[in-house]
Regions:
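Short, low-complexity N-terminal intrinsically disordered segments enriched in polar/charged residues
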Residues: 2-35, 39, 43, 155-177
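Generic, low-specificity signal for short hydrophobic/alpha-helical stretches with a mild N-terminal bias
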Residues: 7, 19, 42-49, 60-63, ...
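A beta-strand edge to alpha-helix "cap/lid" segment located at domain peripheries
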Residues: 9-12, 68-177
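Soluble or luminal CAZymes and related metallo-dependent hydrolases
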Residues: 17, 59, 105
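Hydrophobic pocket/interface hotspot
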Residues: 22-25, 37-38, 45, 60, ...
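Aromatic side chains
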Residues: 25-29, 41, 47, 52, ...
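A solvent-exposed, acidic/Ser-Thr-rich amphipathic alpha-helical stretch
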Residues: 34-38, 42-88
Length: 177
């Protein structure tokens, strides 16, 4: 079950609307509310991270739907958030058990955001792929996590998983690109 520290994600009329939106996004994430996360995204959103380098539109929301559906013990902590007219930033931590190996993962992530029409139109998350692979995949990840072929394999497997999820997800829970 996801953990939410209500004091950790406060929004306020005194905050810039973009900072409030970032906090709303991560509060939904911590509640395991993929629909709430997707509502923060512009229909033309572009998402990227080391595992999903190019997701457009509904693919981004479906990626979160898939990840939340698979993460039985996810805890999300928003460590920092800021936003203004030029963009936004967040530092957050995900703690979960990697389902394919049963290994615990603590992933420290930095997010950059751009906005259009009061919604997130660009979302780029960055984290150490080697550190993630070392935790998620164990000794193999530690030994090979810095090599491009492992990253390509993880990306391919993730893309295939998302394609399968999108093919099987009910239409009312998917937004098309």
């Amino acid at each position: 079950m996801a953990h939410l520290d209500a004091c950790q994600f406060p929004t306020s009329p005194a905050m810039h609307p973009h900072e409030n939106l970032i906090r709303e996004f991560y509060a939904a994430f911590a509640r395991r509310d993929a629909e709430g996360m997707a509502r923060c995204y512009h229909p033309e959103v572009f998402f990227s991270d080391p595992v999903f380098p190019t997701l457009h539109g509904g693919e981004a929301g479906d990626m979160w739907r898939m990840l939340l559906a698979r993460a039985a013990d996810l805890t999300v902590t928003l460590d920092e958030a800021s936003g203004d007219d030029r963009g936004g930033r967040a530092k957050w931590t995900a703690r979960y058990t990697f389902s394919r190996t049963g290994r615990p993962v603590v992933n420290h992530v930095s997010g950059l955001f751009a906005f259009r029409d009061g919604l997130i139109v660009r979302h780029h998350d960055s984290f150490s792929f080697w550190r993630w692979a070392s935790q998620a995949l164990g000794p193999v990840g530690a030994a090979l996590g810095w090599l491009a072929p492992l990253k390509w394999k993880v990306r391919k497997d993730a893309a295939t998983g998302l394609e399968r999820f999108r093919a099987g997800a009910p239409a009312q829970t998917r937004r098309t690109p």
